[in-house]
Amino acid sequence: MALQGNVAILTRLQDTASAVQQFKQTNPQVADVTVLAVAEDSDVTQTVTSSSASAKENAFDGIVSFSEQTEELGIELGAVLPLLKTGGVLQLHVANVKEEKKNAILMALMIGGLVDTSDKQESSPFYPEFSDAVSFTSKKQSFESAAIPLAVKSTTTQPIKKWTVLADDFGDDQDDDIIDEDTLLDDTDEVLQAAKADCGDAVGGKKRACKNCTCGLKDENDKPVMSEKDLNSLVSGCGNCFKGDAFRCGSCPFLGKPAFKPGMEKVLLNLDSSDDI
């Protein structure tokens, strides 16, 4: 990459006439040279920001600069690069470059947006104080940007579907779909009675439930048959029969009967009770 066109040079050199002449001879494609003198008590950043050149963004095709403290290189590049045109060339001179220092410089140039960096050991008439100087030559990357088309949200709304009810929907023919609850089966239905009649075989004139009885005949046959006298003569084995169903066992003959006093032969209902029901 060769310097060409309008080039700015930052240097601490006071008398730059001979240096500029030598620079043009070395770089014949350079048409014009602008020298930005850096004072002894100043630095590159202060010189660029305080000079009239700072108002001329993208003014130069090339910039020649130097760095005395690579720790401040990022700040210096932030001040210098706005003056460089897109695709322009930056030539940076640094003295006493070691391997670790070189890597830091290359990283700073890359972060600054410079590409195609090359380095070589080279002295410059603008920096006679630099011993073993290395020049880093880079190109300012051109970042092209384009507008991203935005998808415009459609303002057209779809019509909301509505249910429509016609008068014919309430005709007499719809009554056929309504279930009559009186036709539903219950435990006393004749169908259930017929199922009991078909269950098992009659033995000695008494129906005996089949092995897998589901009609309730088995439970009915297994229920103990006791007379009222037998019920009154029963003695509680658990002692809780008189307390009510909540305390009675599953086979208690008093299930379903109200609570009574211990020792009572019969269970009487007090119909004259004034308690609220």
UniProtKB/Swiss-Prot annotation:
Role according to the record: Component of the cytosolic iron-sulfur (Fe-S) protein assembly (CIA) machinery. Required for the maturation of extramitochondrial Fe-S proteins. Part of an electron transfer chain functioning in an early step of cytosolic Fe-S biogenesis, facilitating the de novo assembly of a [4Fe-4S] cluster on the cytosolic Fe-S scaffold complex. Electrons are transferred from NADPH via a FAD- and FMN-containing diflavin oxidoreductase.
Major localisation: cytoplasm
Chain sites annotated for binding [2Fe-2S] cluster: 199, 210, 213, 215
Subunit structure and binding partners: Monomer.
Region (Fe-S binding site A), start-end ranges: 199-215
N-terminal SAM-like domain: annotated span: 1-134
Name the record gives this protein: Anamorsin homolog
Keyword terms, alphabetized: 2Fe-2S, 4Fe-4S, Cytoplasm, Iron, Iron-sulfur, Metal-binding, Mitochondrion
Family as reported in the entry's similarity comment: Belongs to the anamorsin family.
Annotated [4Fe-4S] cluster binding sites: 238, 241, 249, 252
Cofactor field: [2Fe-2S] cluster; [4Fe-4S] cluster
UniProt source species: Phytophthora infestans (strain T30-4)
Molecular function as annotated in GO: 2 iron, 2 sulfur cluster binding; 4 iron, 4 sulfur cluster binding; electron transfer activity; metal ion binding
Region (Linker): 135-191
Location of region: Fe-S binding site B: 238-252
Subcellular location: Cytoplasm; Mitochondrion intermembrane space
InterPro entries reported in the protein's UniProt record: Anamorsin, CIAPIN1
Record's keyword annotation contains Transmembrane helix: no
Record's comment describing the protein's domains: The C-terminal domain binds 2 Fe-S clusters but is otherwise mostly in an intrinsically disordered conformation. The N-terminal domain has structural similarity with S-adenosyl-L-methionine-dependent methyltransferases, but does not bind S-adenosyl-L-methionine. It is required for correct assembly of the 2 Fe-S clusters.
Motif Cx2C motif 2 mapped to chain: 249-252
Motif (Cx2C motif 1): 238-241
UniProt record, GO biological process: iron-sulfur cluster assembly
Pfam families: CIAPIN1
Gene Ontology CC terms: mitochondrial intermembrane space
